[in-house]
Amino acid sequence: MRVLCVAEKNSIAKSVASILGGGHVRRRDTRSKYVKNYDFSFNFGGNVGSSDVTMTSVSGHLTEASFPSEYSSWSSVPQDVLFDAQIITSVSKNAEVLADNIKKEARNAQYLYIWTDCDREGEHIGVEISNVARASNPSIQVIRADFNNLERSHIISAAKRPRDVSKNAADAVDARIELDFRLGAIFTRLQTIQLQKSFDILQNKIISYGPCQFPTLGFVVDRWQRVEDFVPETYWHLRFVDKRQGKTIQFNWERAKVFDRLTTMIILENCLECKTAKVVNITQKPKTKYKPLPLSTVELTKLGPKHLRISAKKTLELAENLYTNGFVSYPRTETDQFDSSMNLHAIIQKLTGAQEWDSYAEGLLAGDYRPPRKGKHNDRAHPPIHPVQMVHRSALPSQDHWKVYELITRRFLACCSDNAKGAETLVQVKMEEELFSKKGLLVTEKNYLEVYPYEKWESSDQLPEYRLHEEFQPHILDMMDSSTSSPSYITEPELIALMDANGIGTDATMAEHIEKVQEREYVIKRKKRGQGVTEFVPSSLGVALAKGYDEIGLEWSLTKPFLRKEMEVQLKNIENGQLNRNVLVHMILTQFRDVFHLTKQRFDCLKNSCRVYLMSHNEPQT
């Protein structure tokens, strides 16, 4: 039996071939310097049995969408014709040598074994590979490996338990590709032609539209507008300070702030007339700081910028590199709960021997282990991101690789630990009718915090002794004024959280959309003043587009998340077999026809917005 295996990347093909071939692998060059063929023998069992195997790969998607040549002229073809124009799906020029390699290797094979990533995109790439292989061998049988990491026993098990490629998942991607291609072409042509005619500054610029990029831009502009509109307000509060046992204790006024000076003065005078404060409540209770949930892709892309000072896109790229080298599990997953059948102790055992957490891992194995918390998400395809093998810092190609590996590993160990525990004391005092309070925290067991330095929970200065019903005179009781603080520009973790909550993109594509709006020069990334974190501000063009679409008066503006969110829900329904691909495409295109015609009719709103914001040349400082 001859079997052709095809992975999504050469690094995966090389790793899987090495595992299945048991070290007896012959490498052959292809016409692509990035892709090799690996020959070996393996007994798959079942219907396939002992086989001569060739493992090769693609480099992502093989095919691309295009319109026939008669639609290529932007100036002579009306944009709305593209709603119904034929779409040609063909092997992209960059992938032709890869497709030729698959055709050649498939000719004498009885089985095509798909080893692409086990996500929605991977299923579609699997279908693309199948179509190419069947062009040279129509009778080839197609099966698919179900795997989520490159640990040896897992790969061997996956090789012996194939499944079918998910047509529903591939159909969902096919629908998304068509919709993004049509809508991107239609609105990009409309915007570019109309705005280039009106503004010299845009003469050589493509004003690109993307169904996920524009809502991403909208989030950035919305936060920018809040900053622009902010007017500080003065407020007043009472300061209550006590001194005892050598400690200075500042209580918090439970009204927090009052925006009327006279009212605050009257309250202060009443308290001063009272002269003494009375302790009305002393509460001591246990406090718990819960350990983190198992790690999902969205959470990883938020933690990278926040704690590692690495962009979301770069964090995900580094995690994927760690995955292809067999150090961590598949990093594109929505799942934040471990299946009860997973042997987490075995993973912890592999992590011993590293000086960074050896003693901590040994402690978990010796009895400190606690089952991980269960989140609310399970994509049924992949477990949460976790380490698969121990790797030492010196074995990785860069410090950033280590930072991401360390984060994933420490997060996993934290998940397998106990919550942090402490005790909180609350003292409430009353003066006239005003309540003032002070809390003190004593952390008694750090537990997961010992291995997870990305979160802090520290004991406060301990409160001196207070007795219930005790009366005393405050050391200081006066009135202070302050001003409300401006909102800040949006950070990358905040932007990802908004995109996730509103269904903009998938866990695997959010970081790419953020990069894309920067490439399009709609959004600028800059260092937050006085801090190491970065923030996003819109460019003049970004503001002009967002404001212009808002002025058009669409029921759902293209820079708001509602249209894309609904589409993502429906794509899930296709994946789950609850909706037909063609039905969704027709429904979305009908919806966007109305959006297009109203946008074209009121395009002066966009032009006026560009006059206001582009002509100011007031770009944010980077």
UniProtKB/Swiss-Prot annotation:
InterPro entries hit by this protein: Topo_IA (IPR000380), Topo_IA_2 (IPR003601), Topo_IA_AS (IPR023406), Topo_IA_cen (IPR013497), Topo_IA_cen_sub1 (IPR013824), Topo_IA_cen_sub2 (IPR013825), Topo_IA_cen_sub3 (IPR013826), Topo_IA_core_domain (IPR023405)
Pfam assignment, any one: Toprim
Catalytic activity: ATP-independent breakage of single-stranded DNA, followed by passage and rejoining
Keyword Isomerase set for record: yes
One of the GO BP terms on file: DNA recombination
GO terms assigned for molecular function: DNA binding; DNA topoisomerase type I (single strand cut, ATP-independent) activity
CDD domains xref list: TOP1Ac, TOPRIM_TopoIA_TopoIII
Keyword Cell cycle listed: no
First-level EC class: isomerase
SUPFAM superfamilies on file: Prokaryotic type I DNA topoisomerase
Keywords of this entry: DNA-binding, Isomerase, Topoisomerase
Chain ranges of the Topo IA-type catalytic domain: 166-596
Similarity section: Belongs to the type IA topoisomerase family.
Protein function: Releases the supercoiling and torsional tension of DNA introduced during the DNA replication and transcription by transiently cleaving and rejoining one strand of the DNA duplex. Introduces a single-strand break via transesterification at a target site in duplex DNA. The scissile phosphodiester is attacked by the catalytic tyrosine of the enzyme, resulting in the formation of a DNA-(5'-phosphotyrosyl)-enzyme intermediate and the expulsion of a 3'-OH DNA strand. The free DNA strand than undergoes passage around the unbroken strand thus removing DNA supercoils.
Record protein name field: DNA topoisomerase 3
Organism expressing this protein natively: Schizosaccharomyces pombe (strain 972 / ATCC 24843) (Fission yeast)
Organism placement in taxonomy: Eukaryota, Fungi, Dikarya, Ascomycota, Taphrinomycotina
Gene field: top3
